[in-house]
Regions:
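Short, charge-rich amphipathic segments
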Residues: 3-8, 12, 28-34, 83, ...
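Generic hydrophobic, helix-prone segments enriched in Leu/Val/Ile
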Residues: 19-25, 29-32, 46, 115, ...
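Structured, beta-strand-rich domain cores
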Residues: 67-143
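Mixed-charge, glycine-accented linear interaction segment located at domain edges/termini
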Residues: 144-223
Length: 223
């Protein structure tokens, strides 16, 4: 029988950082339901993605003078995106529209979008080079955000934009719908991970796109 041990060399894991963010705007007209998103575009200047899941709260039911059971509420995925800038393609997701070259207006309908970003996994031997996780988020909708413009002074700071993002889950065969999928590079075969990244980030022949969970699972589970 195995004896438990703690903090062995190589097992001291941690997570940090966020980078390689990609925006996938929703298509105006979806022809193929398995490919509802437009080509991805790189999101430069990302500083933070703060995941804020909610729900999954118990409601106690009592009967016969005892606690009968707990009913769990549905869980939802939400996040806050923080960045120094954003791709031009995000403007329609943020409620802006162009009325002429160089002129935009706000308070317009907000387009849904998908998102991918990477977080780093480190350990005591390889530091931040141990691995990473790719996060895929579906059915995102950004809420209006505050922008604080201040005078330039002797302590210059760049404005950090921030958006509250809600999500709508998508179907996953054999499971409940989800809006958040995570791929762990330390557990997925290298060849399959490369194939997935070619889909997400594009190749010389194909535009980057956001695959739905069923396609990701089929790719990773396939031979």
């Amino acid at each position: 029988m195995a004896v438990l041990s703690w903090d062995q060399t190589g097992d001291r894991l941690y997570e940090t950082g966020t980078d390689q963010c990609v925006l996938y705007p929703m298509l105006d007209t979806v022809v193929d339901v398995t490919k509802p998103y437009d080509a991805g575009v790189a999101w430069n200047g990302l500083t933070a993605v703060n995941e804020r899941p909610s729900g999954a709260e118990p409601t106690a039911l009592w009967a016969d003078n005892i606690k009968y059971l707990n009913l769990m509420s549905a869980e939802e995925f939400a996040a806050t995106i923080e960045a120094y800038t954003y791709p031009e393609e995000f403007e329609v997701c943020d409620g802006s529209r162009s009325v002429a070259t160089g002129i935009t207006i706000g308070q317009q309908p907000r387009k849904m979008f998908g998102l991918s970003y990477r977080t780093l996994v480190g350990n005591d031997q390889k530091s931040n080079d141990y691995g990473y996780k790719i996060h895929l988020v579906y059915g995102c909708l950004a809420s209006p955000s505050q922008k604080n413009y201040q005078t330039v002074n002797d302590s210059p700071e760049a404005i950090t934009f921030s958006w509250e993002v809600s999500s709508t889950p998508v179907d996953v065969s054999g499971f409940k719908p989800t809006a958040h999928l995570i791929i762990d590079s330390t557990k997925v075969a290298a060849a399959k991970l490369t194939a997935l990244k070619e889909i997400l980030y594009g190749t010389a022949q194909n535009d980057p796109r956001l695959p739905l969970p069923n396609e990701v699972a089929t790719l990773v589970n396939g031979n």
